[in-house]
Design a protein with these regions (language model features):
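Sec/Tat signal peptide C-region and signal peptidase I cleavage site
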Residues: 21-25
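Catalytic histidine-centered segment of alpha/beta-hydrolase-like enzymes
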Residues: 286-295, 299
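Bacterial N-terminal signal peptides that target proteins for export
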Residues: 2-11
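Conserved HGGG/HGGXW glycine-rich cap/lid loop of the alpha/beta-hydrolase fold
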Residues: 47-90
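Bacterial N-terminal signal peptides
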Residues: 11-19
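Flexible "cap/lid" subdomain of the alpha/beta-hydrolase fold that forms the substrate-access gate
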Residues: 26-31, 41-43, 53, 67, ...
């Protein structure tokens, strides 16, 4: 049976439940760091906890630390591994935009799972991490225990909205600039330059922002844009890609409804494209970075949802 919508009122009750703690700390000094090798490309990760493997994949502009609240909340029951995607922070930054083709991003996740001696894991992705997570589930379904997506509609839904929804088309103007432009263009990032400070504009916590600035100092801006140049959907009215493969995996989707990049209409029909149970959770007051804007809601719901499947 498909669960189409988990009501926020019910989730708020979970947050108040004494069985699950609703406030989570910072794991910066608690995690262990390491590298997985993918055909000579080193993929950095931070990990904490013990138990079934959970892989967390960040988006743009971000790094492993985006998942700090969820890592703390899940670590009692799961081994949580948050990766730096290639091009970001401490992971390798291979030359050439072709090095960021989706097949390589997907293979990085597979290499990370194998690095931990596992043949499958729960895959959690936000933004570009969400795109990679969807594609990983299509390409390597046997390696996906559960799939969790944050603020990135199913590719079928995103393609539909890009082709027909003027709001989504307007929201995606930045992506078209990234595809056509260069990291050195003076107006590439929402009318201004791309640098470590400007990329951290969305981080409200001053201490966290310091960490983001340092991580972006270590990152490749050309690599960040290569994700868009190589993989962003080229969709127009009457010209949409073929439907994505049908999924059959437990699926949990979060969406911050104040997202100005990805329209929530893209969530419609998600349940039609998955033959297993599908749960969609909206966070009305959260922006694009829902894992931070609604940290307690996301962490507590994710923990409950995963534990219910053990």
């Amino acid at each position: 049976m498909k669960l189409l919508m988990l009501m926020r009122k019910f989730l708020t009750g979970l947050l108040l439940c004494g069985a699950i703690v609703s406030a989570y700390g910072d794991v910066w000094d608690e995690v262990s760091h390491g590298y997985a090798d993918n055909n000579g490309v080193k993929i950095h990760y931070a990990t904490t906890g013990t138990g079934p493997l959970v892989i967390m994949i960040h988006g743009f502009p971000d790094f492993w630390y985006s998942w700090r609240h969820q890592m703390e909340g899940l670590s009692e029951n799961f081994q949580v591994v948050a990766m730096d995607q290639r091009g970001y922070n401490l992971s390798d930054q291979p030359e050439g935009k072709e090095s960021y083709n989706m097949e390589y991003l997907v293979s990085d996740v597979a290499a990370l799972i194998r690095h931990f001696g596992s043949d499958k894991a729960t895959i959690v992705g936000h933004d570009w991490g969400g795109i990679v997570s969807w594609q990983f589930a299509f390409a390597r379904p046997e390696m996906v225990e559960n799939l969790v997506i944050l603020n990135l509609p199913h590719p079928n839904g995103l393609a539909r909205e890009l082709a027909s929804n003027s709001d989504q088309q307007e929201n995606s103007a930045y992506a078209r600039r990234f595809i056509a432009g260069s990291a050195t263009d003076p107006d590439i990032l929402f009318g201004g330059p791309m640098n470590s400070q400007s990329l951290s504009f969305w981080v409200s916590d001053p201490k966290a922002r310091e960490k983001y600035v340092k991580a972006f100092d270590n990152s490749s801006f050309d690599a960040m844009l290569a994700y868009y140049k190589q993989n962003y959907p080229r969709v127009s009215e009457g010209n949409t890609p073929p439907p994505a493969p049908q999924l059959d995996v437990p699926l949990l989707v979060f969406h911050g409804l104040r997202d100005t990049a990805l329209h929530s209409n893209g969530l419609n029909n998600t349940w039609d494209w998955n033959d297993s149970d599908t749960t969609i959770v909206s966070a009305p007051d959260a922006n694009h970075f829902v894992q931070q804007d609604a940290a307690d809601l996301v962490t507590t719901t994710l923990k409950w949802w995963l534990l219910s499947r053990q």
